Curated annotation (Swiss-Prot):
Name of this chain's protein: Putative double-stranded DNA mimic protein ECA2319
Coiled coil regions in record: none
Described purpose of this protein according to its UniProt entry: May act as a double-stranded DNA (dsDNA) mimic. Probably regulates the activity of a dsDNA-binding protein.
InterPro entries in alphabetical order: dsDNA_mimic_put, Put_dsDNA_mimic_sf
Organism: Pectobacterium atrosepticum (strain SCRI 1043 / ATCC BAA-672)
Gene3D superfamilies: dsDNA mimic, putative (3.10.450.140)
Origin: domain of life: Bacteria
Length: 107
């Protein structure tokens, strides 16, 4: 993989959020979609992290944080706080030539 051909943090966040919006209607309860849409402006967010260790239970490849990121999308209790109501965790490959993502949806 090429370190010089990676998505920036902002690009990774934007790409993961776009994928979330495209697939949310098929993967979330209608009530959760309504809540997310009503509250996102005030309490919503997307945060970028290194991939959590539990991804190893869901994928069978090396999750090198140089090339993979986890984007957590959801709602916080108040603006500026940590996201506590998680609607999706998106694992995304940051290498521009490898369009790979995996999503764990709110149950």
């Amino acid at each position: 993989m090429d370190l010089n051909n990676r998505l920036t943090e902002d690009e990774a966040l934007e790409q993961a959020y776009d994928i979330f919006l495209e697939l949310a209607a098929d993967n979330l309860d209608p009530a959760d979609i309504l809540l997310f849409n009503l509250q996102f402006e005030e309490r919503g967010g997307a945060e970028l992290f290194d991939p959590a260790e539990d991804w190893a239970e869901h994928v069978d490849f090396d999750l090198n944080p140089d090339f993979f990121a986890e984007v957590v999308i959801g709602l916080a209790e108040q603006e500026g706080e940590e996201i506590t109501d998680i609607f999706a965790r998106v694992l995304i490959c940051r290498e521009k030539d490898h369009k790979l993502c995996h999503i764990l949806w709110k149950e």
